[in-house]
Amino acid sequence: MAYTAEDVKRLREATAAGMVDCKKALDEAGGDFNKAVEIIRVKGLKGVTKREGRSTSNGLIAAKAEGTTAVMLELNCETDFVAKGDRFQAVADELLGHLFASKQKDLAAFVASKLPSGKGVQEAIDEANATLGEKVELRRIAVIDGSAAALYLHRTSPDLPPQVGVLVALAKADDVVGKDVAQHIAAFAPQYLNRESVPADVIDNERRVAEETARNEGKPDAAIAKIVEGRVTGFIKEVSLLEQAFAKDQKKSVQQILTDAGNSVSAFYRFRVGQ
């Protein structure tokens, strides 16, 4: 069965394979389009294991919020060329829709689940791996369910998909405050919600480092305890969302901004591609 240039084009669009590979597949398939798709898929899947050790430092953040449900995921690939492509972004959209519908918070359980089409999530990722010719992996997911939520996606470059994403769980819906706090989180990257959520071992380590630093600086023994506590307090303010100075008004903390608005934050998630 003969094939045309239009068949090659259609096969490239369907599989994201190169022109030469598409021609070879059509030759091998005797011009049968569906068989050619299967040939490319099989050949691509054979290369999946070879890509397992590769680094996936590129990709995108996808998120969706509606009502009292908000979800976010990070899908990784090897190059920004693939990250910018429609095929890769379509995979992310399909996974995001399934995540929103399932509200599954456990990554392993989500990857083991099935999409509405009946295809497994892992199978969809493996197919993307094969057709795109790069290692593709779902790195992490986040779900807020049962509370008002705000989301913010940030592009670090206009030609790239979102590289930073934030979800914020609020006591009540507030588009203005929610967006402001989400943008603040994107910019200042807090690690914890408040001082109470900073692990004791993290504080102990910071206190130990602060004391060693103060002694190395030659500070008098009588002043060291006060210096250490001051530095630990500064550290907590730096890493805790509610303790941080608010991006739009440095004279107020994020907690004060929320209090003024009659609102509160119970949780947040911040993803940045590759971090």
Feature-to-residue mapping (PLM):
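N-terminal assembly/interaction segments in proteins that build large macromolecular machines
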Residues: A2-Q275
